[in-house]
């Protein structure tokens, strides 16, 4: 296991999204127009709005792992490089990400993070049920 810090241009390519181009599932999307620093992942092949930069791995990093690496590194980068409500596309080239170059470690990390996110979603759904019950109880008692 060897953790490396590299410039994004060494491990990925990026471009401003082209509204007419279909991008592959798993690419990372960085919102650069009217942004609050959103980093998303494309869930299925499709078109992407031009307010995003599309980041694709050059092969050293698995797409899901690249997404999590960018998402982790992005907040301080965003606060340093944003200009008003926007982020200059050219500044994305200054982003540094930390990653493990062992693909098996990347796969394990992805499995563990996805399991945690699945559990988080289940808890959020359970909390929503309790909130709905609470709302119903207030309606019954105070109406």
Indicate residue ranges for each PLM-predicted region.
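A short catalytic or substrate-binding loop motif that flags glycine-/basic-rich loops and adjacent residues
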Residues: 21-23, 46-47
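Short, well-ordered secondary-structure micro-motifs within conserved domains or adaptor modules
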Residues: 24-32
């Amino acid at each position: 296991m060897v953790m490396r810090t590299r410039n994004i241009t060494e491990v990925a390519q990026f471009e401003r999204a082209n509204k007419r181009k279909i991008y592959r599932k798993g690419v990372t999307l960085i919102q650069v127009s009217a942004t609050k620093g959103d980093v998303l992942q494309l869930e299925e092949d499709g078109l992407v709005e031009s307010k995003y930069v599309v980041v694709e791995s050059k092969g050293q990093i698995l797409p899901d792992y690249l997404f999590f690496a960018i998402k982790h590194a992005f907040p301080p980068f965003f606060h340093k490089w944003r200009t008003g409500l926007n982020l200059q596309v050219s500044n994305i080239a200054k982003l540094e990400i930390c990653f493990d170059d062992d693909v098996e470690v990347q796969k394990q990390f992805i499995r563990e993070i996805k399991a945690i996110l699945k559990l988080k979603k289940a808890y959020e759904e359970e909390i929503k049920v309790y909130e709905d019950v609470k709302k119903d109880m207030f309606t019954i008692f105070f109406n």
